[in-house]
């Protein structure tokens, strides 16, 4: 029997920890009612949408007293300014994401991205937000438009569970293609190791920002890529170009590698700051729920 995808990457312990979190859109959104985010439409231009039962903590002025007189029950008038956000998860499935180091609990970067994306999808749907999915390598491989229904969550999780790493990546090109899929204001959440052309990456990310998209960049990396711990003569194989391999003394390369890696990270951090993008560097040795809890707490203080 095929394992339930809901619990392959989204475990009950993750659900328990994620359920207490709340991801609020920073930018005003526009869309269907019923969510928790601030709308772009305010004041007299706001249209009445529907009633919902009054709960403790609601503003008294929002109570529909005429309806109370007819039903003897308290109801709140909901307007178009109580909106849900459209979020798009963009998950890298290129060959480099298939790396797993000695400290990653046997998880590849792709495994980690799938589980983190699953947690994000569950969190968004539980907030009555709409979540969509794009998986990619050199091009978009799967595209699921944003929806908020519980059965839609299953489709997203099944697609994530079926994704396989392969080949090279063109993150900048893929994000440029994404522009045509994100016509309405929302949040784009990118999960990738971001190994590639940084200038092309931010050229596309800046266009997404100009297209009214809030962008979250989860850069998923392995501890080995951060500190290059290799000591003995090692055969390094490319995970994207399978014919490329190199037998070297890693100690002689370590200083040069760490310098170039630091420059790469500084470029990503600087590009995110310049474009007002949330950069969340994540190591595969970190717990998923802790990563989300820490980020959301920091986001709430910004």
Feature map (PLM): residue ranges:
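Von Willebrand factor
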Residues: 152-189, 198-200, 221-222, 226
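An amphipathic, basic-hydrophobic helix/alpha-beta surface used to engage anionic
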Residues: 1-148, 187-191, 197, 203, ...
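Short amphipathic alpha-helical interaction patches enriched in hydrophobic/aromatic residues
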Residues: 97, 101, 160-164, 276-279
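Helical mechanochemical/support elements of P-loop NTPase systems and associated helical scaffolds
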Residues: 61, 83, 152, 167, ...
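Short, well-ordered alpha-helical scaffold segments within catalytic/effector domains
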Residues: 114, 118, 171-175, 202, ...
